[in-house]
Structures are given as structure tokens and as C-alpha cells.
């Protein structure tokens, strides 16, 4: 069953290998000793196979940072920067390039690094968090690092061996994947998602006509991580080339600009190499000290061009598109660049967690899993993004896998109604395959579509024993929903007393009576509170519900005092909606708990996860959006039901009702 993210998904932290950081640290402090992690020991098994030759492996020793030459160790010295990172003996540029981009984004790095030090409550134990299949996983490590000749074997600490957060974070990631050998060559997409839980946009530089400067600026504005990769060279290993670039290598994209050059403008892009030293920088046009920088009269020249031996450099966008093969953007929501590189903020998400398919190794038809979704309205450009993340487990990760362990197809279901599972005959008779996946093995795979309105089914099959995975389906929302905030009447931004229109509005719709019914309330709300398309309006049934919840005389009408109480809530709910919305006019069902927390009338009211799941089904549409009228009905009903229970319960734990009392309570409200 599909569900939308609940607060427990965001707040609960999974303890990797059931290791609790606080318990382990406090135990070590009480015993006066430093932590030794037996689940990732200071041994050859943690380095893994095929990374080092046996002779070199025998020379590896493990030391804590304070035992290395240099000044006193620090977790973070001054501030976090990509220049704190220097790649070592593992070919994990794919991880370090993503990490370099992460350093520019406080939103993500705070989730991963947390506050730690080598002084306060130091016990030789550190922790880091990674996103795995919809949940944050906390990995605990000790601070013993593999060294040779007093030099760290893998990521090198900078600032005279004094700053160690990159080394320790790399070790935690190696533990998560199995060993340091599992860091040796990988995919940028996997690292980006593991560090953020975001969605990947893959730009094929040789074939995609993209305005790179605008794309980078758009993605940066959205808080995205941006990386890129070079193609392989004559060998299947990273090799430094004459132009200063490295083949089969990952880089961090750090900026892009239009710069004045001669009598026109030229587009340039800034990159950083995780090798972290000047010899591994681009030597062509716009490189450090090049003729182009001498000739430009751009007033930003001194700001942009800082010649340092740090692995960062500029190059022209034209050269970039020729020399690099792909650029990867990772963001909380899909970044679609098919319509002028504009950022479309209105997306809803359906998430299927902990999905397991049992394979069929004995031959015969393969087992499958099916996931349904609907496209409601036609729109231009990419409107559906399907993301697959395979769990990091020994059964899923096998080096001999040459292809993605799951096959995926998106199939148009036509007029077929959704059911638990379509039979095989359905697929043989309809054959409406939109797209299938066919890709080399990686743990994260993203497919983008432009789909017409209709019902669709995602079919997943596995090639071997079993596979556990997360499936996320992002559906673009139409502009009318995205700009719902513009449908609010601006007179509602103040409190009722500020605009002074409550009484006059009521009198106008009461038509010389002292009260209004549901039909009059519907006209009042849709004319005075909302000005938008019909789908955003209060329905008659919703207005009947509001009347039933607010009236005290049980006559199906609201008098002026009852209307004043309703109006006060509507104004407050509007502020709640605008505060909680994911993007302008878009409130997702996964954020209903935030609406509860921000509603003054619900102080002291708590609901369970099970009830929260039920109300998301009750008050959201097919793609997980909650309209303003639906939010109003939900919040008012929750307040009314909680107050009713407290009024009727004698002990606050339960209540006794006759059948007629129960029926009267639930049928009218």
C-alpha cells in the first residue's frame, strides 16, 4: 500500500547494527577507556579484498588521531569546507565529490555530522547519519584509522593533520557498505542519495541541450547538490590526462557564471577535484592563470578568479560539455530542466517502503510487485518521476551483478480499475509499456516521464533470489494547485478585527436574517475567502459539516456569534496552511502533523500514527494533496471530536454512550 511520509519517518533514527551511540559512549566514559568497535574492527577485514596488495596490506597499522604527528586533533577546525577533503588510496571520488557539494549545504550537513569533538566527552567514538531507503540510519565508529608511515591510507586530514571529520565520515560510510573496498569505484547517484535522501536529475551533457549556467543557478537556489563525471579513458581506471582532467572521475560543481569577455559574454563553470591539489586541475581555457582571465574586464574578476592549488578551477561551458559526460543534480524535489530550466515546486510524493520481491531461481515466471498511480491532468514537460533505491544488504549488493537487480516497467492501465494485483493476462493483452529500465548496477535509479492523464501501474521484477527496495513516485501538480496561495483573498491576512469586515460580510449573506445556512455559508466562503478554480472551493457538503461542527442550537444554521468563532478559525487556518505548505499553494498529506502542531486551537491534542494515516487517506486527493477546504474540515473536526470526548468522559480515559447517543453524535457531525 502506498503511504505518504509521516513524522515518524523523518524523526526516527535507525541504529545501524543496533549500536546506540549514547549508551556506548557513556559506558566508555564510566570505565575510563576509549571505544573499540568490534563490528568494524581495526583489521584487514574492514579494509576488504582487492583494494591493497597483500604486501602493502601487511604494513597497515591503525591509529587514533591524537597518535598521529601534528597538532591536537579537531573534529571540525574553523568551519566545514570542500577544501577539508583530499582523496586518498581508495577510488571513492564518487563519494567525496558528493560530500564536497554537501559542505555547501548546511541543511544536509547538519543531519549527517552533528556536534562532536575530541575534547568534550571524548571516548574515541563518533557517529554519522546516512539516508537509507526512506529512513536515516546512524552509524557508530571508533576513531582508529588505517595508516602507513603515519599517513592516513584513505582520506587525508588537512591543516597539518588537525581536522578529521572527512576521515571519520569516510570510515562510517565504509562500515555502512561493508568495507573500504566497497568505496573503491561507485556511482555518484548512490552517494548523493545516501547523503540527502533526495531525487536525482541526470543531465547527459553530450545530448541534452541545457543552459548550463541557468541550470546550475536554478539547482543551487533549490538547495541541490551538484556533481559531474568524466568518461572513461583507455583503461577502466582513473588516469590523469594532459589537459589536467582525470578520466573516469567525479567532480563537484561549485558554480556557473556568464562573464564579460572581449566584446561579448562567455559562460563558464567552476569545478572541484576531490584529489585536492593543483596538478589535477584543468589546463585549458579559463583555467587558473590563463589568458582569458588576463583579458577579461569583468568587474567580478577578482572575486571569481582566485589562483590556488586546491583542486578548484574554472572552464568554459563549451569545453565542459565536450570533456564531461554527465551532470547530476540531487534535490528534495525533482528538478526538471525541460522548460527553460524553471523550477517547478509543485510535486506530490507517493512512497512504497520496504518492498521485497522473492525471486524464482528454479525457473518459470518471475515474481513481480505492482504499484498503481494516476495522472490527473495534462501538462507540458516531465510530469512523473519514478525513483528506485535498493537496500544496502549483503543479499542485494553483489559485485558480480552487471545490471540493476530489478527490472521496472511503467504500463498504461487504460480504463482498468485499480486492484490489488493485475493478473499476467492483463500484461499480455494490453502491452501498453511506457518505458522499461535497462541499466548497469547501482543502488539508485531514476526514470522520468511525460505521461498523459490516465491510470498507470509500475511493475517490478527481480533477476535473482530476492530484492528489498524503496519506490518513490513523484507527480507534478498543475499550476493552479501550485499557486493556490494567490487564491486567498489578501484581506484575510490580518486578524478579523484588523480588516473589520466580518460583521458586514455576515450581514450581506444573511439577507436581513439573524443567521445563515450551509448554502449561504458556501457562497460566503467561496466569494470572500477564496478566489480560485472550482476544485479549490468549499463544497456544499463541507459547508454542512462546518455548520454542524460550529452551531450550538442544532438547527442547521449559524448565528452571528457562531459565525464569528468560525471566521476566527478560518483566518488562523489560512496562516497555518501558508506556513506549512511545501511550496506556494501545495500542502502534502505528509505534512498534516505539522498543521496540527501549528494550530492554536489544538493545543494538548495528540493523535496516533495509525489515526494520522487514516486521516491522510480521508482528507487528501489521489496524489497526496490537501486542499485548503479539506484542511479546514480536518482541523475543525479534530478539535470538535477531542472536546466532545473530554466533555462526555468522566475519567478522561473512556466514555459510555447509548446506541442512540452514539448515532446522533457521529451521523450529524
Swiss-Prot record:
InterPro entries, per database record: Calpain_cysteine_protease, Calpain_domain_III, Calpain_III_sf, CAPN3/13-like_C_EFh, EF-hand-dom_pair, Papain-like_cys_pep_sf, Peptidase_C2_calpain_cat
EC number: 3.4.22.-
Expressed in which tissues: Weakly expressed in lung and testis. Weakly or not expressed in other tissues.
Any matching Pfam family: Peptidase_C2
EF-hand domain sequence ranges: 538-573, 636-669
Enzyme class: hydrolase
A single Gene Ontology CC term: cytoplasm
GO molecular function terms noted in the UniProt entry: calcium-dependent cysteine-type endopeptidase activity
Superkingdom of the source species: Eukaryota
Active site: 93, 249, 273
GO biological process, alphabetically ordered: proteolysis
Keyword Zinc in record: no
Keyword GTP-binding attributed: no
Keywords annotated in UniProt: Hydrolase, Protease, Repeat, Thiol protease
Domain Calpain catalytic intervals: 34-333
Protein family: Belongs to the peptidase C2 family.
UniProt function note: Probable non-lysosomal thiol-protease.
Protein name: Calpain-13
Amino acid at each position: 500500500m502506498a503511504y505518504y511520509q509521516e513524522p515518524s519517518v523523518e524523526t526516527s533514527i535507525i541504529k545501524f547494527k543496533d549500536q546506540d551511540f549514547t549508551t556506548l559512549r557513556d559506558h566508555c566514559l564510566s570505565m575510563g577507556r576509549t571505544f573499540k568497535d568490534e563490528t568494524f574492527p581495526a583489521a584487514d577485514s574492514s579494509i576488504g579484498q582487492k583494494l591493497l596488495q597483500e604486501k602493502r596490506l601487511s604494513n597497515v597499522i591503525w591509529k587514533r588521531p591524537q597518535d598521529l604527528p601534528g597538532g591536537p586533533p579537531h573534529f571540525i577546525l574553523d568551519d566545514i569546507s570542500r577544501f577539508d577533503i583530499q582523496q586518498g588510496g581508495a577510488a571513492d571520488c564518487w563519494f567525496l565529490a558528493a560530500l564536497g557539494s554537501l559542505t555547501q549545504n548546511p541543511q544536509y550537513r547538519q543531519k549527517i555530522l552533528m556536534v562532536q569533538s575530541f575534547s568534550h566527552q571524548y571516548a574515541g567514538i563518533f557517529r554519522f547519519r546516512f539516508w537509507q531507503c526512506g529512513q536515516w540510519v546512524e552509524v557508530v565508529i571508533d576513531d582508529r584509522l588505517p595508516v602507513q608511515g603515519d599517513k592516513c591510507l584513505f582520506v587525508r586530514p588537512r591543516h597539518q593533520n588537525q581536522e578529521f571529520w572527512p576521515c571519520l565520515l569516510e570510515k562510517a560510510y565504509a562500515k555502512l557498505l561493508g568495507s573500504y573496498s566497497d568505496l573503491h569505484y561507485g556511482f555518484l547517484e548512490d552517494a548523493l542519495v545516501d547523503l540527502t535522501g533526495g531525487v536525482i536529475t541526470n543531465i547527459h551533457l553530450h545530448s541534452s541541450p541545457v543552459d548550463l549556467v541557468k541550470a546550475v543557478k536554478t539547482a543551487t537556489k533549490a538547495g541541490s547538490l551538484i556533481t559531474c563525471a568524466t568518461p572513461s579513458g583507455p583503461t577502466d581506471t582513473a588516469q590523469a590526462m594532459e589537459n589536467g582532467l582525470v578520466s573516469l572521475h567525479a567532480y563537484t560543481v561549485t558554480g556557473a557564471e556568464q562573464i564579460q569577455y572581449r566584446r561579448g559574454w562567455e559562460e563558464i563553470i567552476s569545478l572541484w577535484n576531490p584529489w585536492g591539489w593543483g596538478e589535477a586541475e584543468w589546463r585549458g581555457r579559463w583555467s587558473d592563470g590563463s589568458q582569458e582571465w588576463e583579458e577579461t574586464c569583468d568587474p567580478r574578476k577578482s572575486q571569481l578568479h582566485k589562483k590556488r592549488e586546491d583542486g578548484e578551477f574554472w572552464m568554459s561551458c563549451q569545453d565542459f560539455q565536450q570533456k564531461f559526460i554527465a551532470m547530476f543534480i540531487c534535490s528534495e524535489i525533482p528538478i526538471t530542466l525541460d522548460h527553460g530550466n524553471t523550477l517547478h515546486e509543485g510535486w506530490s510524493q507517493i512512497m512504497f517502503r520496504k518492498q521485497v520481491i522473492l525471486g524464482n531461481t528454479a525457473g518459470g515466471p518471475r515474481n513481480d510487485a505492482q504499484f498503481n498511480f494516476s495522472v490527473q491532468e495534462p501538462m507540458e514537460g516531465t510530469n512523473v518521476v519514478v525513483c528506485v533505491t535498493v537496500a544496502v544488504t549483503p543479499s542485494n549488493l553483489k559485485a558480480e551483478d552487471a545490471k540493476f537487480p530489478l527490472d521496472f516497467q511503467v504500463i498504461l492501465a487504460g480504463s482498468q480499475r485499480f486492484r490489488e494485483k493485475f493478473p499476467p493476462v492483463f500484461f499480455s493483452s494490453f502491452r501498453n509499456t511506457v518505458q522499461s529500465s535497462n541499466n548497469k548496477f547501482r543502488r539508485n535509479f531514476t526514470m522520468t516521464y511525460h505521461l498523459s492523464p490516465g491510470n498507470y501501474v509500475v511493475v517490478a521484477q527481480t533477476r535473482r533470489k530476492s530484492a528489498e527496495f524503496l519506490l518513490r513516485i513523484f507527480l507534478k501538480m498543475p499550476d493552479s494547485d501550485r499557486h493556490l496561495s494567490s487564491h486567498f483573498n489578501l484581506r484575510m491576512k490580518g486578524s478579523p478585527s484588523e480588516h473589520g469586515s466580518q460583521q458586514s460580510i455576515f450581514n450581506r449573506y444573511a439577507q436581513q436574517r439573524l443567521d445563515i445556512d450551509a448554502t449561504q455559508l458556501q457562497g460566503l466562503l467561496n466569494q470572500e475567502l477564496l478566489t480560485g478554480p472550482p476544485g479549490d472551493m468549499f463544497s456544499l457538503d463541507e459547508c454542512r459539516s462546518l455548520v454542524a461542527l460550529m452551531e450550538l442550537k442544532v438547527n442547521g444554521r449559524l448565528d452571528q456569534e457562531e459565525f464569528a468563532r468560525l471566521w476566527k478559525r478560518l483566518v488562523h487556518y489560512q496562516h497555518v496552511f501558508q506556513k506549512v505548505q511545501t511550496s506556494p499553494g501545495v500542502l502534502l498529506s505528509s505534512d498534516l502533523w505539522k498543521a496540527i502542531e501549528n494550530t492554536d486551537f489544538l493545543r494538548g491534542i495528540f493523535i496516533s500514527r495509525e489515526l494520522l494515516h487514516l486521516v491522510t487517506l480521508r482528507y487528501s486527493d489521489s496524489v497526496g494533496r490537501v486542499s485548503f477546504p479539506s484542511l479546514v474540515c480536518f482541523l475543525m473536526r479534530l478539535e470538535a471530536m477531542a472536546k466532545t470526548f473530554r466533555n462526555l468522559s468522566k475519567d478522561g480515559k473512556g466514555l459510555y454512550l447509548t446506541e442512540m447517543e452514539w448515532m446522533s453524535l457521529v451521523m450529524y457531525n
